[in-house]
């Protein structure tokens, strides 16, 4: 997905490996997938994203772990997705994590989400309208559709204080 996928190193890795060119999801119990160390954050010489430089970025479907690329046999060990999620993928639902920050089993319990519900007041500039607010609504609606978020909207009230365009006459 061109809107969501990034051809760079940073960002959350997609939990996807490929069998005969078809994407397969890594099961939730085997997450998170941690980005491997790489020496350079540039694309490969043949134009693959930076994760194409990683030497340990293959999925062992039997051991359910990330292994060396040299072990890829297309029978039980397969290549992992080389693109990553954009930076906003992990930062656009942060308020939900605050609701249950000590929870080590899920991003937040249903009890905490139902108790806290959505943010009472969000204050942000107009630059948020096509950035963070848009993505926050996307994630909230996605999580609501999947049964993880209790409310349709992430913020009850929004105050947009505007944007500074130039010098002020006030001292």
Segments from the language model and where they lie:
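Structured secondary-structure scaffolds
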Residues: 1-171
């Amino acid at each position: 997905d061109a809107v969501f996928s990034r051809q760079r190193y940073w960002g959350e890795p997609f939990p996807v490996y490929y069998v005969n060119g078809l994407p397969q999801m890594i099961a939730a119990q085997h997450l998170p997938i941690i980005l491997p160390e790489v020496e350079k954050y540039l694309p490969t010489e043949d134009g693959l994203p930076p994760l194409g430089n990683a030497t340990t970025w293959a999925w062992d479907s039997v051991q359910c772990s990330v292994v060396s690329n040299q072990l890829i046999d297309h029978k039980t060990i397969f290549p992992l997705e080389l693109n990553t999620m954009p930076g906003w993928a992990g930062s656009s639902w942060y308020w939900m994590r605050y609701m249950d920050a000590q929870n080590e089993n899920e991003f937040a319990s249903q009890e905490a989400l139902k108790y806290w519900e959505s943010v009472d007041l969000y204050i942000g500039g107009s630059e948020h309208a096509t950035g963070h607010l848009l993505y926050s609504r996307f994630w909230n609606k996605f999580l609501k559709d999947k049964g993880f978020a209790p409310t349709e909207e992430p913020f009850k009230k929004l105050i947009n204080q505007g944007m500074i365009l130039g010098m002020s006459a006030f001292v």
